[in-house]
A protein has these predicted regions:
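Gly/Thr-rich phosphate-binding beta-strand-loop-beta motif of the actin/hexokinase/Hsp70
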Residues: 51-75
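Short, flexible active-site recognition loops that position polar ligands and cofactors
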Residues: 221-233
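ATPase catalytic-site recognition across NTP-hydrolyzing enzymes
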Residues: 1-59
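Glycine-rich phosphate-binding/hydrolytic loop that grips phosphoryl groups
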Residues: 235-243
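Mg2+-dependent endonuclease catalytic cores in nucleic-acid-processing enzymes, primarily RNase H-like
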Residues: 82-224, 249, 262
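Acidic two-metal-ion nuclease catalytic site recognized across multiple nuclease folds
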Residues: 9-14, 20, 243-264
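Short, conserved catalytic/metal-binding motifs centered on acidic residues
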Residues: 61, 124, 238
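Short, glycine-/Ser/Thr-/acidic-enriched flexible segments
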Residues: 64-65, 74-76, 127-129, 193
């Protein structure tokens, strides 16, 4: 944790210690963090891998029962010696808390970042052009995200990726990036992405007449204690959009909401 962390400063309180030295009582003032209070502080100020000078890259997955947001930055990896997509965090809202609440949670978490860089690259595909089941209202999902982010003071570069990439292309690109053999490499903050990592590890593959694809059959099942919504494939879909967006669309025209073509 950095020494000048604002969250630590906010949770630090003055206390008094009393001891006896040479037969005399000595009272000393000292400052110490309230660690119970620190546990409640959930913002990006505690993230050591966040680069304050760089923009954020963001993608969502939209569903009736669970909505996901996955956030990253692109910068040089010490491990690979080249640029990598650093997956900083993932978060979700479930059941009665929908997409708008998720964007609000995301803003609360990343609000301190706006002091240094308020630019967000928001990647979305045709799945974001639906409405209804992930929100209360009749706006497209992408419009809700853009509206909320701008309301909170973010400069949004909305990048329309068009139709989702083919499963074979996503599978190949992501596996090669995870293996460190193709750009952009992937590095994941394990503490901030626990559910996402488990979901990625649990994701299976279905093989049909159109080739192989991600097995998303569990998304239709009722949530149970041993099979919670956050450990299913929904979060991995948001991760896929983020990765493919960074790989193929990162250098699109800033601020232009136009569908782009996949670069084969």
């Amino acid at each position: 944790m950095p020494e000048d962390c604002p969250a630590v400063e906010d949770a630090t309180h003055l206390k008094i210690a009393s001891t006896v030295i040479g037969g005399q009582q000595v009272v000393t003032d000292y400052a110490t963090p309230d660690f119970n209070e620190l546990q409640k502080v959930k913002t990006c100020r505690l993230d050591g891998d966040l680069r304050p000078e760089l923009p954020l890259h963001l993608a969502f997955d939209y569903n009736a029962n669970i909505n996901w947001a996955v956030t990253g930055q692109v910068f040089r990896s010490e491990k690979y010696g080249r640029d990598a997509l650093h997956v900083l965090s993932s978060m979700f809202t479930k059941n009665e808390r929908k997409l708008r609440e998720l964007v609000q949670d995301w803003n609360t978490y990343y609000a301190p970042h706006k002091a240094n860089n308020r630019v967000v690259y928001y990647y979305y595909d045709t799945t974001a052009k639906h409405k209804g089941y992930a929100i209360s209202g009749q706006q497209d999902f992408k419009d809700i995200v853009i509206e909320e982010l701008r309301r909170f003071g973010w400069e949004v570069n909305a990048i329309d990726m068009g139709r989702p990439a083919e499963h074979e292309l996503k599978h190949k690109d992501i596996n090669e990036a995870l293996a460190g053999v193709s750009y952009p490499f992937i590095q994941i903050n394990t503490e901030n992405n626990e559910a996402l990592i488990v979901a990625m590890e649990n994701t299976g593959v279905q093989i049909g007449r159109d080739g192989f694809r991600k097995d998303k059959s569990k998304e239709k099942y009722i949530e149970t204690e041993v099979d919670p919504l956050e450990l299913r494939t929904d979060g991995t879909d948001a991760f896929d959009v983020l990765f493919m967006g960074v790989k193929y669309f990162q250098h699109s025209m800033d601020g232009i909401c136009l569908p782009m073509r996949w670069k084969k």
